[in-house]
């Protein structure tokens, strides 16, 4: 197998006009980004390296797009890409976000649920400032961050109270490996969780990135309310985000049968960064 493991830095002399990026996490979402690059949809960028577990998955992705396969995140950081796209996990973000940012590398995040931890969020922002880098939160399976952030700014400027909540309907089988599982969910629709976004990520670390991302643009993980409904025979997820102040109400409701939209949101974000016209 042609396994191009990278151990040294990458020379940017090859193409100074293009921004470079790497991918951390070579599963379903990471490969959507890699495939989009291969299709020519990220023409302003050069993909220089990937990493992920199992290593065989990273090797497969690297061969597909003809870039370096890094044995671990340290080797990818050593290549000094302009951006690292995270499509790995909440645990990866907790362990690596700060040092990536301190290295001066911009970080594009999918596993935003990690930032329900206010202390980690604060350290990541401080690391970004120290390293002169940016944290880019991909919209993932939802969207509307622009209007949600605008509404929150209005609330703060006019000293108005704001209410924000995220209501999700999803298939029952997604709750099988969680503390709320019971056999009744196979046949009966049920509300399995109601609480704050911070509480939700503690119980469902792999299912509520949407809630945490939305909360960061509105009232925060401690006060944004999350309601999760388990629905028998349901395919996909339906996320309804509502934020309201006196005189303004924003509702964003998005259904997706698979998580593919989260991977494509990264592609759209990278294109937006490189475009002469930015949509917020």
Residue ranges and their predicted role:
Residues 71-102, 114-118:
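Beta-loop-alpha module in the N-terminal Rossmann-like domain of NAD(P)-dependent dehydrogenases
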Residues 67, 103-105, 130-133:
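A short helix->loop->beta-strand "cap" motif at the edges of active sites that frequently abuts
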Residues 54-79:
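Conserved N-terminal Rossmann-fold NAD(P) cofactor-binding segment
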Residues 24, 32, 136, 141-280:
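Active-site-lining helix/loop region of Rossmann-like oxidoreductase modules
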Residues 53-55, 112-115, 141:
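Short, ordered loop/turn segments at secondary-structure junctions
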Residues 86, 109, 135-139:
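General beta-strand structural signal in soluble alpha/beta enzymes
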